[in-house]
Amino acid sequence: MSIEYEEIDSIYLRNEPIYEIIRKCNDDILIVEIFSKEYESNDFVLFYFSDSVKSEKIIQLTNEYAQQNAVVIGVCKKSISIIDKKFVELKNQFDLVFENLTETQFEDLVEACYGTKSGEIHGEPYDWILLKSKNDNLCYVISAEGDSINDVTELISEKLKQKLTKDNAKKTNLICSLEKQNSDSLIMSDVATSINKISEVIEARTKMEVKLWYYFQNKNLVKKYKLVCVFS
């Protein structure tokens, strides 16, 4: 995937956050709504739960969002298949499912969803449905932080290779969300160069195709760059 400088130049910069992140707790279930201020509706709703929660309870909560035009994502701390006998019905409640995610990985996923429309390079929520294969909606998320583009590129490429081997993950669609510490001097041509470089390395080393890129500035980063990859 190659992004041209002219293409980026035509995308208007975000002066005000377009999203608001709303967190709700219902016993052992964390619900994160990514609310679009532009359309006054949720673009994403993420459910984070443990394998001790009964399917009926989660299904009841997801049904409350059924009429919303949102991407609904289920995230289990362990395997969703060991919750109870209704796990198949539960999986079907979600557009996408993630398993065995730590709290840190879940927050990485929230950031990637937030980056969908919040950054200087952005897309649409339903781009995420590209991750869904014909027979399964199981997806994966990994991240890497570093003080240079080379650092995050090397780290993320190695993590991707390990994940593909360990979990026999499908080599299909890959969404990448690049975050950078806030900078007064944002040069979009430099961003384009960085993104194209990362894409080339990832695609060469993993044989995966980078389908979508998001880019936004994050003042809360510990290091200069962070790259979050979501794939099926």
Task: Name every feature range the model reports, one short phrase each.
Residues 1-232:
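Tubulin/FtsZ superfamily GTPase core signature
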